[in-house]
């Protein structure tokens, strides 16, 4: 068997796109037949890569929210901040047994959001409220 007759190790993008288009058009043209495209390799690869990309965007968005925390104001706990701390401990009791660093990040984010909501001098916050 020559090398031209063997299947390629990796499927190219052009052949994958052609295959998807042909399967979609053939499944739309035939009536009464349930298309089995979701079980094909190209569809599984597409959905897997898309879900990983979506998950990466969610993680980056969460990290961007953490970076936006005002780092020096979160350590000056006022009575309102202590009340917020106890309030979020009541809402998320499972966080007491988890990682302490993760607890600190969530607490700092919650306290910062609470402080931003109390601070009416922010011009962009006035537009939102």
From Swiss-Prot:
Membrane topology according to the record: Multi-pass membrane protein
Keyword field: Membrane, Transmembrane, Transmembrane helix
Compartments it resides in: Membrane
Superkingdom as given in the UniProt entry: Eukaryota
Transmembrane segments: 49-69, 72-92, 101-118
GO cellular component term of the entry, any: membrane
Other remarks in the entry: Almost completely overlaps APS1.
Protein name in UniProt: Putative uncharacterized protein YLR171W
Lineage per the UniProt record: Eukaryota, Fungi, Dikarya, Ascomycota, Saccharomycotina
């Amino acid at each position: 068997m020559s090398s031209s007759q063997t299947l390629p190790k990796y499927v190219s993008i052009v052949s994958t796109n052609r295959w998807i288009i042909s399967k979609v058009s053939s499944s739309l043209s035939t009536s009464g037949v349930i298309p089995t495209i979701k079980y094909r390799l190209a569809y599984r690869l597409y959905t897997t890569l898309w879900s990983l990309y979506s998950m990466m965007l969610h993680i980056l968005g969460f990290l961007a929210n953490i970076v936006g925390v005002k780092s020096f104001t979160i350590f000056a706990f006022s009575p309102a901040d202590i009340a917020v701390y106890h309030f979020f401990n009541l809402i998320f009791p499972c966080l007491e047994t988890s990682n302490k660093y993760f607890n600190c990040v969530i607490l700092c984010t919650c306290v910062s959001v609470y402080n931003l909501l109390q601070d009416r001098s922010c011009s962009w916050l006035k537009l939102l409220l």
